[in-house]
Amino acid sequence: GSGLGDVLGISARGVELRLEPGSPGAGGKVLSFTTHQPLLLVWRPEESRHTSTYIDDEGWQRSISNAGERSVSRLRRKEWTFERWPDLMLESRNFAEASGLLNEEVRKELLSQVQKEILRLDLQARVNVRLCMLGVSVSILPRRLDEPLLDGELSDIADALRARGFGVRRTSIR
């Protein structure tokens, strides 16, 4: 993408925590830690949601902003380091629930189907599946940063999900 969040993520590198809106140097404040982690993005090819559906709607604006502020408030209480990954995974789940994004049936169904494949592959102890903020997509992430997902595990997951009709792309946190 080319939105502000994408640009800031690229400029901060690694895993960012945006403390204040805006970009660094223009009022924004971002913390980050570096890690290199392979991951998968998964989506339903026939489903599309445009960001404007959410950011142009007052109800969505309010619920997303409130949920995000609560999560950031909890995350900023301690130093932002590699060891905070489990906290980030917890807050990403909390955000999806509190914002109402997880209440949309198409998202809930996608998350459920991907989680079922992870269980079938017996990789639930190694993987977190998290909704992407907008659109109908999920990220498949390592449960622990000191135990990156292996190429074979990523290939097995990708093959299983493609066989079920999902779009899958391998990418990474850098």
Residue ranges and their predicted role:
Residues 7, 17, 39-41, 137-139:
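Conserved hydrophobic/aromatic beta-strand scaffold that supports enzyme active sites
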Residues 11, 41-45, 132-133:
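Short beta-strand segments
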